[in-house]
């Protein structure tokens, strides 16, 4: 499960020696209550473990309840900055020593932060799990925040901010989020600005860590060539004595809706491509409409050549380099987005074509054959996600985060197959209002092209 808009910090190397897998048979059934161990430690850490003996590797994924919702408003980016520093040295190991230890066994450890959580992940051979867990626990429990690395990471973040300012897709995304959320905490920039990153000092990083990094609500998922009970015991061995509670996170205000069309254009005259994003407020992940909207979104901009948007705007009309839609839902709210990258001369035509497809979805029932194709896509893609330990760990972490229940994967196909064309029409009419949406465009505007010509 990816929660970070800022790249995780990872150290890895090429694969090392091959080790024979256990003679036990690989797990082929969908994960569920019968083969996923779930255990809560006395300090509030939840451990989920699933065995898979088809390869000698183990994947670990998890998160802590600290994110950019916990930042001071004037220090946006503090959560991801703190996450970037976790692998930069601890009270027991230097940055170089961590790298050498991890690289010597061909393993990887990564961190990232999003709005709600700070995530971590590891990958290693099963025989090296003890070492990886020891280093992971050291990084999470005893980071040193060495001053020289604080400045090195600051430089990397400043470079990322500069690169983002030169990227039409990212700038359109920033503008869209500002339109949708305004001053709401969910609209905060994960990476932060040049000003906020310049203002973040080492003592702010240390204070943020010491205030919010606590085991309460932490989740650790282990999947691979290790017994479930053994995996849980190993996690308890390195994290079980971690104590303390973080301050309660204040309740978020209600996300404001849209009362009309909001539009923002970000001129980037030196670019050859413009990026368009249309956005509508959507539902939280646990809302009864979510699965209906998932199917509707598959029709609109996922299935085949990116759904109807791709078929119309890209393939049939030839106006876009890409066109697709996405449904993003969190605990409090959601966004329904339609995006396209186009030749700047096609901006207005592409916007009209995208809106036409959205309106068609909200005004006409999806034909039975198209609906069945999209259902088969959704149900057929699930086994592909579960082919790897990474995929299983990601889904289990997502299930735990949203409280979907360990049987969710086993229920999923029935949920999707039970949806109808009326469900798709209903949810499209409810959320994809023709007169209430946000529009963000970044790139050369038509006037820029005229001047250039």
PLM segments and residue spans:
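Conserved short beta-strand edge segments in small beta-sheet-based binding/regulatory domains
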Residues: 146-152, 248, 364-366
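Short, low-order "capping/linker" segments at domain edges
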Residues: 163-165, 260-271, 380-385
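His/Glu-rich zincin catalytic helix
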Residues: 1-101, 121-124, 134-136, 206-312, ...
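Generic structural signal for individual residues within well-ordered alpha-helical segments
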Residues: 99, 130, 151, 198, ...
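M16 family metallopeptidases and their MPP-like homologs
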Residues: 48-50, 55-84, 93-140, 158, ...
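A short, flexible N-terminal coil/short beta segment enriched in small residues
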Residues: 152-161, 165
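Histidine-acidic residue clusters that define the catalytic metal-binding segment
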Residues: 15, 19-39, 178-218, 250-256, ...
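Short, polar/flexible loop-turn hinges at active-site or ligand-entry regions and domain interfaces
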Residues: 88-92, 140-148
């Amino acid at each position: 499960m990816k929660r970070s808009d800022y790249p995780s910090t990872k150290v890895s190397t090429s694969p090392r020696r091959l080790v024979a897998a256990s003679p036990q048979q690989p797990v082929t059934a969908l994960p569920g209550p019968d083969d996923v161990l779930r255990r809560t430690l006395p300090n509030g850490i939840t451990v989920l473990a699933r065995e898979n003996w088809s390869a000698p590797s183990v994947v670990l994924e998890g998160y802590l309840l600290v994110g950019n919702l916990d930042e001071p408003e004037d220090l946006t980016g503090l959560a991801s900055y703190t996450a970037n520093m976790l692998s930069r040295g601890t009270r027991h190991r230097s940055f170089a020593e961590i790298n050498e230890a991890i690289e010597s066994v061909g393993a990887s450890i990564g961190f990232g932060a999003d709005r709600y959580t700070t995530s971590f992940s590891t990958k290693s051979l099963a025989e090296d799990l003890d070492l990886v867990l020891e280093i992971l626990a050291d990084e999470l429990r005893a980071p040193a925040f060495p001053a020289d690395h604080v400045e090195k990471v600051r430089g990397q973040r400043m470079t990322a901010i500069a690169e983002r300012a030169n990227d039409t897709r990212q700038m359109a995304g920033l503008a869209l989020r500002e339109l949708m959320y305004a001053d709401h905490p969910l609209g905060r920039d994960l990476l932060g600005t040049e000003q906020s990153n310049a203002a973040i000092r080492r003592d702010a990083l240390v204070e943020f860590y010491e205030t919010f990094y606590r085991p309460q609500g932490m989740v650790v998922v282990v999947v691979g060539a290790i017994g479930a009970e053994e995996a849980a015991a190993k996690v308890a061995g390195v994290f079980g004595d971690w104590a303390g509670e973080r301050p309660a996170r204040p309740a978020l205000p209600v996300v404001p809706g849209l009362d009309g069309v909001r539009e923002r254009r970000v001129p980037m005259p030196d670019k050859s491509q413009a990026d368009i994003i249309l956005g509508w407020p959507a539902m939280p992940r646990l809302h009864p409409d979510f699965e209906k909207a998932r199917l509707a979104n598959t029709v609109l901009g996922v299935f085949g050549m990116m759904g109807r948007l791709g078929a119309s705007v890209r393939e049939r009309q030839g106006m876009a380099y890409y066109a697709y839609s996405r449904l993003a839902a969190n605990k409090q709210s959601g966004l329904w987005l339609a995006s396209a990258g186009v030749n700047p001369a096609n901006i207005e035509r592409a916007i009209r074509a995208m809106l036409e497809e959205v309106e068609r979805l909200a005004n006409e029932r999806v034909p039975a054959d198209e609906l069945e194709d999209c259902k088969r896509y959704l149900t057929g893609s699930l086994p592909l996600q579960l082919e790897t330990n990474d995929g299983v760990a990601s889904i289990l972490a997502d299930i735990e985060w949203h409280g979907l229940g360990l049987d969710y994967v086993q229920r999923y196909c029935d949920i999707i197959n039970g949806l109808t064309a009326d469900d798709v029409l209903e949810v499209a009419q409810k959320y994809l209002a023709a007169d209430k949406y946000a529009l963000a465009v970044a790139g050369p505007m038509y006037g820029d092209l005229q001047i250039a010509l």
